[in-house]
A protein has these predicted regions:
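Generic signal for short, ordered secondary-structure residues
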Residues: 3-4, 30, 82, 89, ...
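Membrane-targeting and insertion segments and their boundary/processing signals
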Residues: 18-21, 77-80, 84, 107-110
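Short C-terminal domain-edge/linker segments immediately following a structured domain
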Residues: 33-38, 64-66, 89-93, 107-112
Length: 179
């Protein structure tokens, strides 16, 4: 089989670590993958080294979060093989800081409704560079409030049309500035 050019690891909101992702690709006979974590380049060099060791070509990339002002919606730009990854680092850091603040605020909102602590959610986010909605849902699953991360409780807490929504959207840059 060819490849998968949009893979996330535990460094962002993926379920697998870098090596486990590469081993899964090898097992599935996927020859090429691109590691494109959200606003994070941290796994690209390690991924390349591990990929070479296991015969899987790893393309370094990143999924950059931004906003399309014309549509008034979030957008995600996939960037591969950047000539200047150091120039992307500042943007990734700013986006991560915004995402971290939003995640911390969502944890506090969730803790008002459920007996969970920020420390427990952070434990469920272990290995990630940020706090994502699924980390909060994972903590609630571990506490027995749901049997799945992306089920009804997830929709109730994070869907914008839910009266119980605790979702807080991070502030991201204008897509035109990113391009």
């Amino acid at each position: 089989m060819g490849g998968d050019l949009h893979c996330h690891t535990r460094l962002s909101d993926g379920s697998l670590g870098i090596e486990d992702l590469i081993l899964l690709a090898q097992k599935l006979k996927i020859e090429t993958i691109a590691i494109t974590d959200h606003d994070c380049l941290a796994g690209t060099v390690r991924g390349k080294v591990i990929g070479d060791r296991h015969g899987v070509q790893v393309i370094p990339g990143v999924e950059i979060s931004c906003v399309d002002p014309k549509r008034e919606r979030r957008a995600h730009l996939l960037c591969y093989l950047s000539d200047s990854p150091d120039r992307l680092e500042g943007l990734c850091r700013r986006n991560s800081l915004s995402r971290r603040k939003a995640g911390q605020y969502m944890i506090l909102k969730a803790a008002k409704r459920f007996p969970i602590t920020p420390e427990f959610v952070l434990k469920c986010a272990s290995g990630s560079t940020n706090i994502f909605k699924q980390h909060i849902a994972h903590a609630l699953m571990e506490c027995g409030y749901t049997h799945t991360i992306f089920g009804e409780l997830y929709q109730d807490l994070f869907s914008s049309d839910s009266p119980n929504c605790i979702s807080v959207e991070p502030s991201f840059p204008d897509v035109r500035g990113v391009l």
